[in-house]
Amino acid sequence: MTRLRCFLGVARRRFPGGLAAMKIHVLPAGPIQTNAYLLTDSARGEAVLIDAPGDIWAEIEPILTETKCKLVELWLTHGHWDHMQGGAEVVRESSAKVRAHKDDQILIETPEIMIEIIGRDLGLEPVKVDTWIAQGDKFEALGVEVEVRHVPGHCMGNVLFYFAGNKDKKAAGAAFVGDALFAGSVGRTDLPSGSFEQLERSVRGQIYTLPDDTLVFPGHGPRTTVGTEKRTNPYLQG
C-alpha cells in the first residue's frame, strides 16, 4: 500500500478542480490481473468503481470503510468477463448504479456467451445496467464532469471515461480507457466483434485527440500518457 499511496499523491497534485479531492486506488484483481479503479472522495463520502474484476469487492470494501465512502456507481468500460466478473457481487453489496455501453449489452446481461468464448465456466453472473451510455454523453460524478468516448475495436462496447484537465493550473486530465490502449500496446482484436482497423480509428480519433499530458489508465498494466503513446506505441505509428 505504501507504493500505491505514493502514486496516488502524485496523481492528485496534478488534477484540477474537483479532481483534487479525489483519490484513485489502482487495484489489479481477478485471474488475469485486470485493473479496477476505485475513485474516492472522502469530503463527499462517495466513491465510484471503474470495472469489476473477480473478487474486487473484497479489495474495495476495506478502502470504503477506511475512507468513509459509499460506493454509488459502477462504470464498465466494456463487457468482457475479466472486467465484469465481480460486478454482480459489487451491486449486491453496495446497491451501486451501473453504467455501460449498449453495444455490449448481450455480454453484460448474458455472460454465458463469454463462457463459450473463453471455453471455461468462471461463475459469471449477469450485471443489471441502470444507465446505457453513448458517445459524447456527459454527466457529473463526485462533483466533476465526466465525458464518455466510444472506442470500439477491442469489442463493440468499449468506452473511455474522461476527466478534463486545466491548462491554466497546469493540471492533467485523466482517461480510463479499458482495453482500447495500453502502455506500449493495444487491446487484442481477435475476439468476436474485434477489429484492428476499427480500434486504430478509435484510438486515433478518440484518445490521441486528447491533450498529450492526459493520464491514461488502462485495463491492464501501468498507466501512461497520451503523448507517450503517440510518440512510442509501436502498433499505431505512421
Where are these regions (language model features)?
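Short, Lys/Arg-enriched N-terminal segments with co-localized hydrophobic residues
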Residues: C6-A21
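Conserved beta-strand hairpin/beta-sheet module of binuclear metal-dependent hydrolase folds
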Residues: L19-T67, L160-V177
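Short acidic-hydrophobic surface loop/beta-edge motif
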Residues: L27, L39, D137-G143
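Metallo-beta-lactamase
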Residues: G45, D55, C69, I113-I117, ...
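Short catalytic-loop micro-motif centered on adjacent basic/acidic residues
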Residues: A47-I50, E73-L76, V148-H150
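Hydrophobic residues in well-ordered beta-strands that form the structural core
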Residues: I50, V98-A100, V177, P218
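Active-site HxH/HxHxD metal-binding segment of metal-dependent hydrolases
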Residues: D55-E140, G165, A172-G173, R231-Y235
